[in-house]
């Protein structure tokens, strides 16, 4: 990860969500139809994807698979559903989820973010900004969270547990976040 960050070349590292992977596996096993009721419930309540009709879930799964297949690196949970999803990821390298957590490494990949314009898309916007301001206290003596040229945090839409997001669909929420990302000036998006 660090080498790619330092190279300046575009790349995609992905972290696969467990419920998302189960939904995609269900899609691949059933030809995109007849999603299991528990799959619909989990993808809505645990991942915030809505509505959970076949057309929405099929569109979600197609995008998810395409992203996985185009990723340079995927971090996996090592759950059974992943086997179905990663079959078509011929050029993708895989790692365990923990490998993306920089504080576990003597030479953290995140050190390569020093001096870069960093965009973070996350539901905990305020917390991230507050913690970044205290970065020297978080990991003393380690280069886990260096000083960035700038930090922009886009508030991720969070629709877990069926909570109202103010959007008609997960795709409408995604489009709004994409517009905010497109308006930001950044070198690296997390």
Predicted region positions:
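Electropositive, gly/pro-rich neighborhoods at or near active sites that engage anionic ligands
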Residues: 1-150
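A mid-sequence, solvent-exposed acidic-amphipathic segment
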Residues: 147-188
């Amino acid at each position: 990860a660090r080498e790619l960050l330092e190279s300046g070349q575009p790349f995609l590292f992905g972290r696969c969500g467990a419920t998302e992977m189960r939904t995609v596996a269900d899609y691949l096993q059933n030809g995109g139809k007849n999603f299991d009721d528990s799959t619909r419930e989990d993808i809505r309540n645990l991942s915030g994807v809505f509505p959970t009709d076949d057309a929405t879930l099929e569109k979600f799964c197609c995008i998810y698979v395409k992203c996985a297949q185009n990723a340079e690196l995927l971090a996996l949970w090592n759950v059974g559903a992943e086997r179905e999803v990663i079959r078509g990821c011929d050029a993708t390298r895989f790692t365990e989820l923990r490998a993306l957590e920089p504080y576990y490494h003597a030479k953290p990949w995140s050190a390569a973010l020093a001096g870069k314009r960093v965009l973070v898309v996350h539901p905990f916007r305020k917390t991230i900004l507050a913690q970044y301001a205290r970065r020297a206290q978080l990991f003393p003596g380690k280069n886990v969270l260096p000083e960035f040229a700038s930090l922009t945090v886009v508030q991720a839409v969070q629709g877990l547990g069926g909570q109202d997001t103010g959007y008609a669909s997960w795709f409408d929420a995604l489009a709004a976040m994409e517009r905010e990302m497109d308006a930001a000036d950044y070198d690296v998006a997390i």
